[in-house]
From Swiss-Prot:
Protein family membership: Belongs to the L-aspartate dehydrogenase family.
Disulphide connectivity of cysteines: none
Record protein name field: L-aspartate dehydrogenase
UniProtKB keywords: NAD, NADP, Oxidoreductase, Pyridine nucleotide biosynthesis
Record InterPro entries: Asp/hSer_DH_NAD-bd, Asp_DH, Asp_DH_arc, Asp_DH_prok, L-Asp_DH, NAD(P)-bd_dom_sf
Gene field: nadX
Record-linked HAMAP family: NadX (MF_01265)
Amino acid sequence: MLKVGIVGCGAVASLITKALLSERIPKARVLAFYDVNYEKAKKLSEETGAESCVSIDELVSKDLDLILECASVSAVEETVLKSILSGKDVIIMSVGAFANKKLFLNLYKLAEEKNQKIYVPSGAVAGIDAIKAGSLGQISDVTLTTTKPVMGLKDAILDLGLKPEEITEPKVVFEGNVFEAISKFPQNINVSVVLSLASKYPAKVKIIADPNLIVNRHEILVKGSIGTIKTCVENNPCKDNPKTSALAAFSVMRLIKDLSEPIRIGT
């Protein structure tokens, strides 16, 4: 049985927890929760019978095999650092943190030294296995075009000085590189960092707000020595968190299931 602890107890964590309590993932269980808002951890604890912790230190001190981060970019460094030093592998959902090259390299080196694993799920996009394979050749271009409902980008749109209600037709709200994208849209464009890590090539990113769209659309174009990879996924948003695609949560569930089973399909 794979014993899991979760950092961050919002809508996505709740969805993943329900899956881990079901027969869909029979060989893994959540045993402990932590959130900066203790009441959120307590609520999930009461619903599941797992422990609620008052700190990450308390969480990683438990008898766990795996820590799942689904909190925020700002929580990644502490979560990964303390998990690895406590002899635990860790899954990172807020992979936007790895746009910070120094942080990525420091945590990579630490995990290597301690013989622990840092897992990055494929998230809300398709084709990551093929792109990883292609990265062993030569990649010449990586482009991500993400289109989301206006309300799914509301906070980021406001931060840009725009009014969501005034967007009445599809509008490009960002065009630039992966580093700029995750800086301006830290809760909406983690997929750009997953794509860049998989391809080992800094993705070019375009973000479109569409008032007529009800799904989160991610279109990928990768060119390289193996040929051209094109994918398009139209994801339903998480019911309680429209900033996140439901597929992002399901990709974590699948990763945990894979880690708990003797045979793994895909790279």
